[in-house]
Amino acid sequence: MLKKVTPLFLVAAVAACSSPLERRQANGGEDYVQAEQAPMLKIPEGLKTPPYNKEYDVPALGPKANPALVGKNLDIRPPLQVLPMAEGTHVEEGSDNIKIVVESIDNNVDLKQEIFTNLDDFFAKQAIPIRSRDFDKGSIETDWIESREVLESSLWGSDKEYLLRQRYRFDVETRPHGRTANIVIHLVEHEEFYDGKEQKVMLSGEDKQRYTIDMLNSAIAYMSVKREQTIQANRLKQTLGINVDLITPEEGAAYWSAKAAYKQVWDRLRIVLPEMGFEISDMDSAKGLYFIKFTDNSGFWSSLWNNNQLSLKEGSYRLLLEDGDTPDETKIWLRDAEDQPLSNDVVSKVYESLSSLMKEERKLR
């Protein structure tokens, strides 16, 4: 079948095209492969051996070096570098593989689920088929990923095409504490074809590493975008005001009910408490405790609250946070240094200052 082509294409068609196999090979001859090492000079007895310059001596092969990687078998391309661009990630290089260590950036999100969701979205966006997926084992194996490139175009017949087919496996290992996980990628299968004929390619460890790094960088780059979106959303959420209600039960001490998740309330209190005149001397987020100290500062309160000072004695106090009855509620108790509840009247008066600052919207920093 005769193809319609433009004159520009005719000019391009006669230009030599290098195949992916040739791109990894050095240009020029390979006579050096057959080169023989010249013997050392034989010095007659009685004469001194002249000094030799060892600057250009070729070092001996190491125990892990492959002696077959010479000539056309030697890949001259520079190595690829792993780019841990996503927030909370870094690289750990082992003897057999390269892994990305991913740290949690949001305690309210399951890290393993976040990684799997990002990988699923990445595969869908890149139209990469999946052969198997096992969340419990932390493994995703792709089906064949094909890349085609036309190397020779014919006017009267079919084009000669180069085809690269690969399959990868992503392993996700989460630490028992759930705050750190590892992502390791393996090249499971690799095939190369030219004009329908399979090419015999000897992949070295560096070749496999090159392909896996390229795929790993693409996946991490996608995760970087998603994590940045999450960080921006969380920062915006932190700027929003939090409504706080005063709860005075018939029995028991009065407390405050903040209409937000525990982490959001905890972070907001770190800003609000100093503005109320409290000094944070210590804190324990796992136990939900703020150890605070109050010092009466009339000048501060006069300017901020129109001479309406907190009805608190100077001294040390504790602020206790607990999860509420719903995920969007956090309960807050104000207690003295001996962990005893304060009177409902004091809690009620402090509430006026606390609620006003908590519901105030902040500028995004």
Curated annotation (Swiss-Prot):
Gene3D superfamilies: 3.30.530.50, Outer membrane protein assembly factor BamC
Entry's localization field: Cell outer membrane
Lipid attachment site numbers (N-palmitoyl cysteine): C17
Topology of the protein relative to the lipid bilayer: Lipid-anchor
Keyword set includes Chloroplast: no
GO cellular component: cell outer membrane
Residues with a covalently attached lipid (S-diacylglycerol cysteine): C17
Purpose of the protein: Part of the outer membrane protein assembly complex, which is involved in assembly and insertion of beta-barrel proteins into the outer membrane.
The family this protein is said to belong to: Belongs to the BamC family.
Name of the protein in its database record: Outer membrane protein assembly factor BamC
Biological source species: Shewanella oneidensis (strain ATCC 700550 / JCM 31522 / CIP 106686 / LMG 19005 / NCIMB 14063 / MR-1)
Lineage: Bacteria, Pseudomonadati, Pseudomonadota, Gammaproteobacteria, Alteromonadales
